[in-house]
Amino acid sequence: MKNPLLRPWLTEKSTKLTEQKGQYVFQVKIDADKFDIKKAVEEKFGVDVVSIRTINCLGKSKRQYTRKGLIAGKKSDWKKAIVTLGDGQTIDYYAKPAEKSEK
């Protein structure tokens, strides 16, 4: 699978996990498995991954009342991965990735 990581998930709870336990949270593709996520994090950030927990989040159902009646819809389902790193390792979300040298 080509890069299952979509974006870092930055919330108060995920920031607290990062500061206290060294765990980082990412939004990943819905069909990504733990092996793909581990490989992508290790390659992109150059760290050792100790463990990964994944959570399937269901999209919310939405309703809108209009003159023509009720319009029902649903937001997309998505997946979240909590990645635990080795001791003393960190990830800088805002650093630019290392540039690849051209051949």
Curated annotation (Swiss-Prot):
Q: Which biological process terms from the Gene Ontology are attached to this UniProt entry?
A: translation
In alphabetical order, the GO MF annotations are: rRNA binding; structural constituent of ribosome
Keyword annotations: Ribonucleoprotein, Ribosomal protein, RNA-binding, rRNA-binding
A single Gene Ontology CC term: ribonucleoprotein complex
Q: Which residues cross the membrane?
A: none
UniProt xrefs under InterPro entries: Nucleotide-bd_a/b_plait_sf, Ribosomal_uL23-like, Ribosomal_uL23/eL15/eS24_sf
Q: Could you tell me the superkingdom of the organism this chain comes from? A: Bacteria
Q: What does this protein do?
A: One of the early assembly proteins it binds 23S rRNA. One of the proteins that surrounds the polypeptide exit tunnel on the outside of the ribosome. Forms the main docking site for trigger factor binding to the ribosome.
The protein's matches in PANTHER family, at most eight in alphabetical order, are given as:
60S RIBOSOMAL PROTEIN L23A
Q: How does it assemble?
A: Part of the 50S ribosomal subunit. Contacts protein L29, and trigger factor when it is bound to the ribosome.
| Family listed | Belongs to the universal ribosomal protein uL23 family.
Name of the featured protein: Large ribosomal subunit protein uL23
Q: What is the lineage of its organism?
A: Bacteria, Pseudomonadati, Chlorobiota, Chlorobiia, Chlorobiales
